[in-house]
Amino acid sequence: MAVVSALAELIGTCIITSTPRLARSAPAIVVSVYLRLAPEHRLPAAIDDGFSALMWLRALARGDHDSYEPWLSNYGDFNRVFLIGDSSGANLVHHVAARAGQVDLSPVRLAGGIPVHPGFVRSERSKSEMEQPESPFLTLDMVDRFLKLALPKGCSKDHPFTCPMGPAAPPLDSLNLPPFLLCVAETDLIRDTEMEYYDAMKKADKDVELLINPGVGHSFYLNKIAVDMDPNTAAQTTDLLEGIVEFIKKH
């Protein structure tokens, strides 16, 4: 059974609508990672925590950890570990995977990364930021305020944490990354910079697939009322989960 490490602070609606369905369908053991939060703990604290969780899985796989997790030790396939995160957690997928590519994970194999609606942005507003409608899950004010609280003090949105395809970041072709599935919502405010990341990954000859959900916005699947009441939101949530499951099964 694949092991999926969820790099996000999962709120109730996400747990209800997404995580159990993913675990059942993959099938997979989903490990929810506890992350220190900003502004008390600015980045790279959450990246450090995500990487520490991966090292904990490696220790379990090697049998050299003091604690014992029956589900993981007895049923987890450490040869198929995936990183998944949504929104800001999707940024962590990229950075934790990049850091993991610099160390020996054996017997763990990082089989893939799944950034869902990543918070990749630039200081200059993109066309989609200026033209797409805001949603309850993401407004321009939220983008600005959240990143001001999360980034290292004095840093702009061009920082590698939020712009891994920018000139300040390590060249993507220099990174040892597993296969990626980038999930994008068509009406997401930050769709254009997410697509810029996809294009940069392809240009760097990285193994990256793209899944676009039409007619929905940032983190649409977290709205349980919409998932239950709106046919398109429900259908797109199913399509998103099925795409993620297909990617996991393929790798």
Q: Where on the chain are the PLM-derived regions?
A:
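Alpha/beta-hydrolase superfamily serine-hydrolase fold, recognizing
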Residues: 1-251
